[in-house]
Regions:
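H-loop/switch region of ABC-family ATPase nucleotide-binding domains
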Residues: 120-121
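Hydrophobic anchor residue at the start of the ABC signature
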Residues: 77-78, 105
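Conserved beta-strand-loop-alpha-helix hinge in the C-terminal portion
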Residues: 138-165
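Conserved ABC ATPase signature
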Residues: 63-67, 71
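ABC-family nucleotide-binding domains
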Residues: 98
Length: 165
């Protein structure tokens, strides 16, 4: 049943603008619990608690269209986590983020006990957040050795910022 699956798996879209549609952050995060049958007070409490857990306390009345890209991505994640899914499906969660926002996403994901399927081209990110890897070749999934997510220090030509992956 697709409805049952939607209640168990949270989807974080690549572009946060496609996921956020309410005027304020609190309304966006409370939308899911309201649709699950929570009262207004329960939905607001769950939303506020989730925002606090993600370091977004104080964002409740902020306008979603005025958030930075990283803030929008974190709020998108909050809209999913507030529903307490059994698993997460994340599509390119670090795409277009500044390094600080990327690190916040990594920090949040590393603390979650929730099973995750992450679609990403960012091997550094995958190395920090995942233990198993699959690659897509044509229409087939293939096990990727963890060596794809290797660890060594280097400097990217455009970033000129040493990091490990």
């Amino acid at each position: 049943d697709f409805r049952e699956l939607r209640c168990k798996v949270g989807l974080v879209l690549q572009h946060a603008e496609d996921q956020l549609f309410c005027p304020t952050v609190l309304e966006d995060v409370a939308f899911g619990p309201l649709n699950l049958g929570c009262t207004q007070d329960e939905a607001r409490d769950r939303a506020a608690s989730t925002l606090e857990r993600l370091g977004l306390a104080g964002f409740e009345n902020r306008l979603t269209h005025r958030l930075s890209g990283g803030e929008k991505k974190l709020v998108s994640l909050a809209t999913v986590l507030v529903m307490e899914p059994e698993a997460l499906l994340l599509d390119e969660p670090t795409n277009g983020l500044v390094p600080e926002a990327r690190q916040r996403i990594i920090g949040v994901l590393k603390t979650l006990p929730t099973a995750r399927i992450i679609i990403s081209h960012d091997w550094d990110f995958l190395a920090e957040t995942s233990s198993e890897y699959l690659t897509v070749e044509g229409q087939h999934f293939t096990d990727a050795a963890p060596s794809h997510a290797h660890a060594h220090m280097h400097v990217h030509p455009l970033g000129n910022k040493p990091h490990e992956h």
